């Protein structure tokens, strides 16, 4: 059990394997900001103005120190009766400057919350919209928990980057430029001293960031693996307990969890030392500038005054702080880019191709007995076939399915179906039997184009199904899948899922046809009983009866029943079989069953072995041949 799950999910990376790196970080950042600007450009312009105002207010407040000391405090110390009026007025002015800066910072934060959450909502919507367009094979090849991790963890990494990191970087850049210009004008000598220390800070930050960045990327990917493993184990919890593999499953989780711990520990170990290192280097820069400034003031070098030194030290702090913040935000951005890489990788997955142009429409017969399109639901369906010459023809949907020389493989190098030839005429019941892995379910997956064939043709009412739009093709099919899935909602809503515009009366009629009405009425709230957790409060037989009712309400001309009665007890099977016989009457039906007794009345039984049809005929004909079907039937070897 555990081994099977490990094969499906991404296995742990070997210790000696190189750590992943973000590909094209500049392109990723451009795409992220493109998503922001597409919907929130005016907001971003206001935020930029707020950031500029806030940064300039802080710089202006630092510059005020020089005037405060040289023009007010020092002269007042030399007065017998100092006048505090000018000083008070100056303090009020600088207080107003601070207030404007605080207001701008508050407005910036408020707007960025709206921008960030709106952008994340849009990304999740785009992800879900695109995910629904992906082919089935994508979900066969990717652990579902890993896909869920993209929606949660990876999208959330963008939250801090958009709400804090990028605004902080912009603010830091504006602050650095304005403070640098002010420092140069105030004292180029002290500016040189400051820049030497800044160069050392940048060198240390770059080294630390380069070491932590690769581990942040690994952390996001390892987190996806852990989520994938948890999701799989939750789905298979009953199987784990049946085979008492709890310890083996726990060992698999610990291995992945330890891998996540190691990558997260390495990432945060480096990230957490950036601020202390840059802060201490900033303190050293402050002390060196204080000593140099004091010496210059005492020596009268360059007209340096006490006010100049105090103002420059304030600017020095204002200069070092954004550099430290840039270093800290760099790791947040790297982690966000790692998440963005996974987000855009999913969004860039090619959608399910559909080159069909034949559509399914409601139809009726006009007074000349010609088939014409109508907007009303008449119970008559037609294929609308546009032609190159601009004309359109309508062909009544009959339910005639034909396979001609069909080959198929899930991967190009391995063919699993060979030279399949069969047909289902309107109203016929075609049954597939054979051992596990013979290709029965694969054939039904080809009818609804979950997968496209490698060679040959499948025709629906004489039309190559590749010419039919997939949505219209699937609307013409009623499908009961091998694994019944029920959605969170009422029983009525789950039945109506087969045709969303169906009335309550039509849903109840479908339930009666599937012989589900009896047990539904015995539920606490009948048809309004809430189902949760994939219908866990229902038996397997009841869940399959609802799936059959869901197919019945769609009222399709063609039915695909993929092992619909394989997990139902004998009594329930009898109920289902009676309902299905009524449902299949007049419809082309393709049936796969574990119990051969359920397909005795089929018009044609196809026996598959290793992807080939080795026998075909009615039940009596195949029994008379005494071949594979005879062995399966008399030996009760179906699916064993």
Question: Can you say where each PLM-predicted feature lies in the sequence?
Answer:
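Transmembrane helices of ABC transporter permease
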Residues: 39, 43-56, 60, 97, ...
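Hydrophobic alpha-helical transmembrane segments of ABC transporter permease domains
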Residues: 30, 49, 104, 108, ...
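ABC-type nucleotide-binding domain
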Residues: 80, 363-640
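Juxtamembrane helix-loop junctions of ABC transporter transmembrane domains
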Residues: 18-26, 49-50, 57-73, 97-144, ...
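Membrane-integrated ABC transporters
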Residues: 1-58, 73-94, 108-112, 116, ...
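Short intracellular "coupling" helices and adjacent cytoplasmic loop segments at the cytosolic face
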Residues: 13-20, 117, 125-149, 153-155, ...
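Helix-loop-helix
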Residues: 75, 182-196, 266, 270-341, ...
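An intracellular "coupling" helix at the cytosolic face of ABC transporter transmembrane type-1 domains
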Residues: 38-41, 136-137, 153-162, 166, ...
């Amino acid at each position: 059990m555990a081994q099977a799950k490990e094969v499906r999910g991404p296995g742990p990376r070997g210790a000696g394997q190189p750590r992943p790196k973000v590909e094209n970080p500049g392109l990723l950042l451009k795409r992220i900001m493109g998503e922001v600007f597409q919907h929130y450009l005016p907001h971003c312009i206001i935020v930029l103005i707020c950031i500029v105002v806030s940064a300039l207010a802080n710089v202006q407040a630092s510059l005020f120190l020089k005037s405060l000391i040289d023009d007010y405090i020092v002269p007042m110390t030399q007065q017998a009766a100092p006048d505090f009026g000018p000083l008070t007025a100056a303090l009020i002015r600088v207080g107003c400057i601070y207030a404007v800066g605080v207001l701008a910072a508050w407005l910036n934060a408020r707007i960025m919350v709206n921008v960030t959450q709106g952008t994340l909502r849009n990304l999740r919507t785009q992800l879900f919209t695109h995910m629904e367009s992906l082919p089935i094979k994508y979900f066969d090849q990717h652990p579902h928990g890993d896909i869920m991790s993209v929606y949660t963890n990876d999208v959330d990494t963008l939250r801090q980057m958009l709400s804090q990191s990028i605004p902080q970087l912009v603010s830091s850049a504006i602050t650095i430029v304005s403070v640098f210009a002010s420092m140069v004008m105030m004292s180029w000598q002290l500016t040189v001293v400051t820049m030497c220390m800044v160069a050392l800070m940048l060198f240390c930050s770059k080294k630390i960031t380069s070491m932590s960045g690769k581990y942040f990327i690994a952390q996001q990917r390892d987190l996806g693996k852990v989520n994938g493993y948890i999701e799989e184990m939750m789905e298979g919890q009953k199987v784990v307990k049946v085979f008492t593999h709890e310890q083996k499953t726990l060992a698999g989780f610990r291995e992945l969890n330890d891998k996540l711990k190691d990558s997260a520990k390495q990432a945060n170990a480096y990230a957490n030392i950036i601020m202390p290192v840059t802060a201490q280097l900033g303190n050293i820069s402050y002390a060196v500038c204080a000593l140099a400034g004091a010496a210059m003031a005492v020596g009268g070098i360059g007209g340096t005054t006490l006010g100049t030194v105090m103002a420059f030290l304030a600017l020095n702090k204002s200069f070092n702080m954004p550099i430290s913040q840039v270093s800290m935000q760099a790791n947040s951005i790297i982690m966000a880019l790692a998440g963005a890489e996974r987000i855009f990788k999913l969004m860039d997955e090619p959608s399910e191709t559909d080159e069909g142009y034949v559509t399914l429409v409601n139809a009726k017969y006009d007074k000349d007995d010609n088939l014409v399109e109508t907007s009303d639901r008449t119970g008559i369906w037609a294929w609308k076939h546009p032609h190159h010459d601009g004309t359109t023809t309508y062909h009544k949907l009959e339910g005639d399915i034909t396979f001609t020389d069909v080959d198929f493989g899930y991967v190009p190098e391995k063919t699993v179906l060979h030279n399949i030839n069969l047909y289902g005429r309107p109203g016929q019941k075609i049954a597939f039997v054979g051992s596990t892995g013979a290709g029965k379910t694969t054939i039904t997956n080809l009818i609804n184009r979950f997968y496209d064939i490698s060679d040959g043709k499948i025709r629906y009412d004489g039309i190559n199904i590749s010419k039919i739009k997939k949505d219209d093709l699937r609307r013409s099919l009623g499908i009961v899948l091998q694994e019944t899935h029920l959605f969170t909602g009422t029983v009525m809503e789950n039945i109506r899922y087969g045709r969303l515009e169906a009335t309550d009366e039509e849903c109840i009629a479908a339930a009666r046809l599937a012989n589900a009405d009896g047990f539904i009425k015995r539920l606490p709230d009948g048809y309004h009983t809430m189902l949760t957790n994939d219908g866990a409060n229902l038996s397997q037989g009841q869940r399959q009866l609802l799936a059959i009712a869901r197919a019945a309400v769609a009222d399709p001309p063609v039915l695909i029943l993929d092992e619909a009665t394989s997990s139902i007890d004998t009594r329930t099977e009898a109920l289902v079989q009676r309902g299905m016989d009524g449902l299949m009457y007049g419809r082309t039906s393709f049936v796969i069953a574990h119990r051969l007794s359920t397909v005795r009345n089929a018009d044609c039984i196809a026996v598959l072995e290793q992807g080939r049809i080795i026998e075909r005929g009615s039940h009596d004909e195949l029994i008379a041949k005494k071949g594979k079907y005879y062995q399966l039937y008399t030996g009760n070897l179906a699916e064993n």
